[in-house]
Amino acid sequence: MTKIRKFIERIDDELEDAKHYAEKYIECKAKGNSDRASKYHAMAEDELKHAAWLHEMTAGEITELDKVFRPTEELQRRWDDSNARYVERAAWVRRMLEM
């Protein structure tokens, strides 16, 4: 269960970094610095990819844990909250990167 908690923390970290880079992308694009904007865009996409992989690994860990015993209510709640944050934040970053 500690592994799952750590995965959840890393997902949040990756999404926060993706958000930061997406904001810098918009800022640089607005200032006409397309070279730097392009780099921030790529960095944001990389962070989104990392978050997606971690999300996938966490879902797999939860599935494996479910075969042995039911996760605690607290862990299930943390995962449900993390999943909702992941969906919301990843969608926000993707929208920013489409600008």
Where are these regions (language model features)?
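Non-heme di-metal
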Residues: 1-99
